[in-house]
Every structure is written in structure tokens, then in C-alpha cells.
Regions:
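Conserved beta strand-loop-helix elements of the APE1-like EEP
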Residues: 60-75, 200-221
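Active-site beta-strand termini and strand-to-loop segments that position acidic
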Residues: 70, 94-97, 215-216, 234, ...
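Active-site-proximal beta-strand elements of phosphoester/diester hydrolases
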Residues: 1-9, 98-108, 142
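Metal-dependent phosphoesterases centered on the DNase I-like endonuclease/exonuclease/phosphatase
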Residues: 51, 122-205, 209
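Active-site beta-strand/loop signature of hydrolases that rely on acidic residues for catalysis
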Residues: 6-7, 23-41, 101, 130-153, ...
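Structured beta-strand-rich core segments of catalytic domains in phosphoester-bond hydrolases
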Residues: 37, 42-109
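N-terminal, active-site-proximal structural segment of metallo-dependent hydrolase catalytic domains
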Residues: 1-47, 57-63
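Surface-exposed cleft-lining segments at the edges of enzyme active sites
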Residues: 81-82, 106-123, 159-162
Length: 244
């Protein structure tokens, strides 16, 4: 099974044809999209054979997530376990039979770090949500987690802990996920990748913000994990995970 996670930075700005062309090249079984910036009725993508799950933000042109899957979900729900309303459209959880899939778009702390308290609370809620799911069966978390936990992921930035996505608190949130038993699939497959090998278009390596994290007991199912820097249309690269 091939899964793709991609922050598309606006569904309407990418346009259907560009997205369809990218999907044809990626040829995946599951697409997890972040920052769709859609509201209901604004142009969902209809892929033959795929089930589409769309989570909208209340605020127009903001946030939003989607899952398009060939495997019909047993069920899906929005938000974290403590926030079923998810007014910002940030999280979709889908039961795909032998594992849970969680597609997430983490809050950005803002350039002045003014939203850092919100982000800390969100990180804590995400961890509790994942732990509750993982107690039942394995979990794959993917998405734009807006945090670079590895020093190698911050390319060409000297401000260190004052850079959004690289603050001590955000890195601690990522560390908590990894310490709780989740594994960074990209780093598992490519432990010795040189810094900046997959550069996020604004200066941070793609894997420095965008991830596939899997339950430790799913590691043996990982076949491959990669980024796709040649796929254009967004300021993020699509990330890929292949499992058996």
C-alpha cells in the first residue's frame, strides 16, 4: 500500500488538473492532504474508486484536511479525542481495518510565536489521541506537523529556537511522540541522509515539517519512505510511505 501526505497550500490555487496530474504520477492508494483551504461546496476532488473525507475549517480560506482512499474506511471522525468539533479542520482519523490513519495539520505558532500556547495544548491533545488509538491497534500519523525536531532539518537558519517550527516547545512535542513509541518512517529508511537533501522550499527540509510516524509495531511493515521534490504546485513536497 502506498500512502502520500502533502500540504497542497490551497486546493483552488493548485487547480484540479495540476492535482490530478500529480496524483497520476504518484499513483498512490491513499492521499492525505493538508491546508486544503476549502469549505463545503467549494470543489472537492472526485477520484474514481476513492472514498473522499473532507474536514473543513469554519474560517474561509484557512486550514482544512482531506483523505482520499481506495480502501473504504470502517469509520472516520474529525478532531482529536477531546475536540470532536475541530472548527479549524485540522485532523481526520480513519479506521482502515488493520490500522488507524491520522491525517493532521498542526497549528503554526506565528512569526512572533504568539500562538505557541495553543500549539503546546494541541501537541498534548494529539499525543493523548494517538495513545488512545494505539492501545487498540497500530497507527499511522501523517501530515504537516509544523515542527523540525532534528538539527539537520533546519537548513540555512541561524536563529535556532526563535524560528517557528523549531522552538524548544515544538521540538519537545515531537520528541514526546517519538518517545511514546512512534517511529519517523523517513528517518528509519534514510538514517544517514545528508542535511537539506530534501529542501522544503522556504528553507526547511521536507521531512523537517512533514512526516509519516508509525507505531513501533508497524516498523516491520515499512517498505519505503521518500519525498518527491519534482512534484510542483505547493511550497511543500509530497511525502510517501509504502507498507506491506
Amino acid at each position: 500500500m502506498k500512502l502520500i501526505s502533502w500540504n497542497i497550500n490551497g486546493f483552488r490555487s493548485l487547480m484540479n488538473r495540476t492535482l490530478l496530474d500529480a496524483f497520476a504520477r504518484l499513483d498512490a492508494d491513499v492521499y492525505c492532504l493538508q491546508e486544503t483551504k476549502l469549505q463545503a461546496g467549494q470543489g472537492e476532488l472526485d477520484l474514481p474508486g476513492f472514498t473522499g473525507i473532507w474536514n473543513y475549517a469554519d474560517r474561509p480560506g484557512y486550514s482544512g484536511t482531506a483523505v482520499l482512499t481506495l480502501r473504504t474506511p470502517v469509520f472516520s471522525r474529525f478532531g482529536l479525542c477531546e475536540d470532536e468539533t475541530d472548527t479549524q479542520g485540522r485532523v481526520i482519523t480513519a479506521d482502515l481495518g488493520d490500522f488507524y490513519l491520522v491525517n493532521a495539520y498542526a497549528p503554526n505558532v506565528a512569526a512572533d510565536l504568539s500562538r505557541l500556547p495553543e500549539r503546546i495544548a494541541w501537541n498534548d491533545a494529539l499525543l493523548r489521541h494517538l495513545q488512545a488509538l494505539d492501545a487498540q491497534k497500530p497507527v499511522i500519523l501523517c501530515g504537516d506537523l509544523n515542527a523540525a525536531y532534528n538539527d539537520a532539518d533546519l537548513a540555512g537558519k541561524s536563529q535556532g529556537m526563535h524560528v517557528p517550527g523549531f522552538t524548544r516547545e515544538e521540538r519537545s512535542g515531537m520528541a514526546a511522540l517519538l518517545q511514546s513509541g512512534f517511529v519517523d518512517a523517513y528517518r528509519y529508511v534514510h538514517p544517514d541522509t545528508a542535511p537539506g537533501a530534501f529542501a522544503y522550499r522556504k528553507g526547511i527540509r521536507a521531512g523537517g515539517l512533514d512526516y509519516f510516524l508509525v507505531s513501533a509495531r508497524m516498523v516491520e511493515r515499512i517498505v519505503d519512505a521518500n519525498a518527491h521534490p519534482r512534484i510542483r504546485g505547493s511550497d511543500h513536497y509530497p511525502m510517501e510511505l509504502v507498507i506491506r
